[in-house]
Amino acid sequence: PDHFDREAAEEFSARHKNALVYIPSRREPAPETLSVGNFTVELHRVRHTQVAGYGKSTVDAMIVSCEGNCVYVASDTAPEAAIHEGILAGRKPDAAFWNGEMLLYKPERALLHVCAEKSFIYHIPIDPQDGLRRKLERIVSRYPEELENVRLLAAYPSVITL
């Protein structure tokens, strides 16, 4: 609810005729998997992080696999280690993408180190003076050993090599 843009999704679909576009419906269960070519996407409908004014909502966390690589996209899942541990079920993806809230709590920070080879934090405000951005930067610098595999994505788009 906080940043879905139906018009942008429809424009993307019109420009990329061969792309599979999945737009979740909160009234229908998520499919367990989507497959396109060599890509497989596992969908896990879970609790969305708290968003003021929206009450309780859900989001689809995803595990994307292709040609031996695996990426976990936590989306805006609530920052609870148990949710992510349940989705990953002992798997260790090559990379994981997390909301910045995961850095705010000790059990969730610990998860970033053990649940993926590389962890990337997104939704980082672009303004270097933004309070949330500065707080996340301080947390990463405060726990260098615990967060050695964590990188803040402060520029969009970013190039990531697995």
Question: Which residues does each PLM region occupy?
Answer:
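Active-site metal-binding motif and surrounding structural segment of the metallo-beta-lactamase
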Residues: P1-S25, L88-F97, L104
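Glycine/Thr-rich phosphate-binding loops of Rossmann-like dinucleotide-binding domains
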Residues: F4-R6, A81, K106, Q129
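Divalent metal-coordination and catalytic microenvironments
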Residues: D5, V41, D76, A96, ...
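Metallo-beta-lactamase
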Residues: A8-N69, P144-T161
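Short, acidic/turn-prone active-site loops that include or flank metal/cofactor-
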Residues: S25-R27, V46-R47, G100-L103, Y122-D127
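Binuclear metal-ion centers of metallo-dependent hydrolases, dominated by the metallo-beta-lactamase
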Residues: R27-G37, K56, E85-G90, R109-L162
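Active-site-proximal loop/helix segments of hydrolase catalytic cores
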Residues: H48-V114
